[in-house]
Structures are given as structure tokens and as C-alpha cells.
């Protein structure tokens, strides 16, 4: 099955343009997006394969428009909502509206 995430090697897309001296992250938000996504893996509610599937299941336009780490952020948001850790309203308002889910593992700073 080839989706938009399987573009590598397909005809008609042209070469991959490599930015000389490209930084690992183009902004602090990208660093945080990756960090939060990886840290949430400690919850035990998903693994690397499910996280990848969540990214690959996004609408195709999400892959071709916007920054790379926006894909990671949107997939994380979807996984958090699907597993009941946050609601869509909480995400939209940027604050908790319901009590935290009990029994979810939390990554502690000492574990990093």
C-alpha cells in the first residue's frame, strides 16, 4: 500500500533538496513537538509503530503543507484524543476541562 508518506523513489516528484548546514530543528517548537511525542510514549498507551501509523493516517495535505514536525504534533493530538487523555475542547482551549485520567504512567525528569 502506497500512501503519500511513501513518496520516496516515486517518479515525478523531483529530487529531494537538501539544505546546506540544515539544523536539526528550525524552531524551538519543533524540538518540543518531538520531545513531547517521545515522552508520551512512556504512558504505555501506544508504541512507536502506533505513533508512526497515526502520522501516516493523516490527510495527504498535512504531508505536503506545513512543517515536518506539524505532522508529529497533529498525530500526537489525535492519539491523545483517541485514548481519552484529552478532549477536543481541551485541545482547542489549551487548558484541562476534565480531571486527569487515573493510572496513566508519567515520564519523570529523573527517568530521562
Regions found by a protein language model. Name each.
Residues 1-112:
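A charge-rich, low-complexity, intrinsically flexible signal that marks solvent-exposed coils, linkers
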Amino acid at each position: 500500500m502506497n500512501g503519500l508518506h511513501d513518496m520516496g523513489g516515486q517518479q515525478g516528484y523531483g529530487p529531494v533538496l537538501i539544505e546546506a548546514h540544515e539544523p536539526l530543528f528550525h524552531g524551538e517548537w519543533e524540538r518540543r513537538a518531538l520531545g513531547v511525542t517521545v515522552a508520551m510514549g512512556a504512558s504505555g498507551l501506544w508504541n512507536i509503530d502506533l505513533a508512526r501509523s497515526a502520522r501516516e493516517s493523516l490527510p495527504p495535505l498535512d504531508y505536503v503543507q506545513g512543517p515536518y514536525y506539524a505532522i508529529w504534533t497533529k498525530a500526537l493530538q489525535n492519539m491523545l484524543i483517541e485514548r481519552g487523555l484529552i478532549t477536543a475542547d481541551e485541545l482547542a482551549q489549551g487548558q484541562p476541562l476534565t480531571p486527569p485520567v487515573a493510572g496513566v504512567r508519567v515520564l519523570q525528569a529523573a527517568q530521562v
